[in-house]
Amino acid sequence: VYKRQMVSIVGRNGAGKSTLAKLICGFETPEQGQVLLNGRDLAQDNIRRRAQHIGYVMQNPNQMISKTMIFEEVALALQGSDMTQEQIRQRVEDTLKVCGLYPFRNWPISALSFGQKKRVTIASVLVQQPELIILDEPTAGQDFRHYTDIMEFLRGLNEQGVTVVMITHDMHLMLEYTPRALVFCDGQLIADRSAAAVLCDPELIEQAALKETSLFTLANRCGIAPAEDFVERFIHEDREVRTHGC
């Protein structure tokens, strides 16, 4: 994965997606091979040190949140660091502004919606200024409006220089938001291609138990070739219309 990329990791349940994330974050130790960040082997880094560079956001925000108040939750990762309390306050406030949570900084977390709690967990990771964020099913349990809000928020973070990796079963998310897709099956990486190329490959779809996009079906039935180009153009135009209204 390269800096400033936005990448999806897809595959059937048990394919190894979450295991890969745990290996990268240091929750599990690889039996062979290396985990490199900027060319440096992370084998000697403990979880806390890795968290300064790599953030992990779980699918259910309630499994990550441990404090009552928003400010306290986001500040938690910085406690015990070399930063002064004033530096921590400033870092937390800056992060809350980026995440659209600053107006709620003194609110109890219990007053937030599921989507807002999701942002709190992202803020608690971002406050450490990681180079890479890994998210497990970032839009799970959200309606379309909140789905769009969280994905546009993540796209904005990516445009600011944060590398974003998403573990997902949502093929539309993969297709619309991530130019690159990594496909896993039985613990092996079986494809590293564009999202459109993945979803226009029937054999790969079957092998990885992915869901064929209706756009690929439409392209085939209408005799449009190459289908990959049609899918990419359609997604681009659809995003432009929803974003700009024309």
Feature map (PLM): residue ranges:
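Conserved ABC transporter NBD signature motif
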Residues: 33-41, 50
